[in-house]
Amino acid sequence: NQSSSSGIAFVKRIWRRKRFARIAIAKMLMTAARTAPKARGTDNLVLAVATDDTIVEIAEKMKQLAVERNMDFLNRDAENILNCGAVVLFGMKISPLGLNCGACGFATCGEKPKNVPCFFNANDLGIAIGSAASLAADLRVDSRVMFSVGQAVLALNMMPECSMVLALPLAVKGKSIFFDRK
């Protein structure tokens, strides 16, 4: 009947708007990360947003890694992201800044093995995700920084140029899904 089909159309319009809203919020958080201070003004940050089927793919990989690595908390985190509208991914390329500071444990950037992260790259990643998490809180969107999601993203080679990936899952529920985790 006419009213039933118009009701379904209304629900579909609302869902599309919710999808638009979660993508818009994710993009705002990515902007906060992109504009966060970085050592020497060098931007080695790689940003992406996962939704829908990509979240499912990441969660499945997390569950697989939970078994392979004997890390049960990966299952809990996988369930968390399955209840999120979007997951913002923050990756960092290893790119020494040539400061020869020794903060990575090696006397010079030249002595540092290629696969060892530059201290400043890791620090920049933390500052960027902190800026994004702060904005999420300002917007009253629940979030939690998760390295576990990043491990699955790396294992799936979703951000091949990155050596480090962290994630900020986003949820808008009546109660934070990240609060009473067991």
Regions from the PLM with identified roles:
Residues 1-182:
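Acidic, surface-exposed loops and disordered segments
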